[in-house]
Regions:
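RNA pseudouridine synthases
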Residues: 1-201, 305, 312-315
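Pseudouridine synthases involved in rRNA/tRNA modification
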Residues: 1-33, 81-84, 205-207, 213-220, ...
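Ser/Thr-glycine-rich phosphate-binding loops at phosphate-binding pockets of nucleotides
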Residues: 149, 156-158, 241-249
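Short loop/turn positions at the edges of beta-strands in beta-sheet-rich folds
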Residues: 90, 149, 229, 239-241
């Protein structure tokens, strides 16, 4: 039998969600079975899957010891790069400027060096990430951007901050702004574009429809033309909705794909010589007014932005970022 005392960071979440993160070596289906079979108790009593944990709760796990493999000593993240461009940090959150070319989470091609592992390494060195404590909160990202997109990513240092950030993003109380270079010239200097986005069944690609379709979700993208030449335009984008690949797929469907985009661009097989990555950067976020007291209410009406964008001249970026 193993006993766990719930701390502040792990409170205010469902017991099943906590156990799935904590018991990483046990399949979720087996965890649910253990709860149903009364092999997991809360404060000595039978619990429901939907039970929300409180600080000080005592979990009793009547599970075979061999299932508690020591996963806390996984130090693979320490092999990741130490390169981390921090825009802002406090005891609850980190705001990072992610360079293009780096994935945010491990995948089949990038199993070690990714943004979240760099953050874990940074916090571990600062003694803020306790890998020897299975109950300690593992740093988590509140938002994601594509591997070849650069810009702002927010990380939470504790579960309450993550919960607040997730709710703020869901309710569109954290606004995200991008700059991008696209092919051609837009029909209007500024506009709010509406369409519907869905997933391709056979490819990791998003499809756009300008009429409602089953399985498609509405997207809204606001743009302003900042500068244009005969062949290309610099756009400022505000995401009204935030779907995967929204900006890239939406602009491509409008006939103005982002330069350097090998998936949604004109040439899907070769990257533009001038643009080794897609010319898209999440350069600014703003927090709306916090209407209720919370752990992060000091961020109310705050604004954060990157210091530079790889595809723009530094002085020019300083000028247009104030617009």
């Amino acid at each position: 039998m193993k006993e766990i005392v719930i701390n502040k960071d792990d409170s205010n979440q469902r017991i099943d969600k906590f156990l799935i993160k904590y018991l990483k070596n046990i399949p979720p289906a087996l965890i649910y079975k253990y709860i149903r079979k009364n092999r997991i108790k809360i404060n000595g009593k039978k619990c429901k899957i939907s039970y929300k944990l409180s600080e000080g709760d005592v979990l009793n796990l009547y599970i075979n010891d061999e299932l508690f493999l020591d996963i806390s000593h996984n130090r693979e993240f320490l092999e990741s790069s130490s390169d981390l461009n921090i825009i802002y940090e406090d005891k609850n959150i980190l705001i990072i400027d992610k360079p293009p070319g780096i994935v945010v989470h491990p995948d089949q091609n990038f199993k070690v060096d990714c943004l979240i592992n760099r953050i874990k390494k940074y916090l571990y060195i600062k003694n803020e990430y306790k890998i020897n404590d299975n109950t300690a909160f593992s740093p988590a990202l509140a938002n994601r951007i594509d591997r070849n997109t650069g810009g702002i990513v927010i990380a939470a240092k504790n579960s309450e901050s993550l919960r607040i950030l997730n709710n703020k993003i869901k309710n569109r109380e954290i606004k995200k702004y991008y700059f991008c270079m696209v092919n051609g010239n837009m029909n209007k200097n500024s506009d709010i574009l509406t369409a519907y986005i869905g997933k391709s069944k056979n490819e990791n690609i998003s499809k756009i429809s300008f009429t409602e379709k089953p399985g498609y979700k509405k997207i809204v993208t606001k743009y302003t033309v900042i500068k244009e030449t005969i062949y290309e335009s610099l756009l400022k984008i505000e995401l009204i909705t935030g779907r995967k690949h929204q900006i890239r797929a939406h602009l491509s469907a409008m006939g103005h794909p982002i330069l350097g985009d090998t998936k949604y661009g004109i040439n899907k097989h070769n990257v533009y010589k001038k643009y080794p990555y897609q010319a898209l950067c999440s350069y600014k976020i703003t927090f709306d007014t916090f209407k209720e007291p919370s752990l992060l209410d000091y961020l109310s009406n705050r604004e954060f932005q990157t210091k530079k964008i790889w595809f723009l001249d530094d002085e020019f970026f300083k000028h247009i970022s104030k617009m």
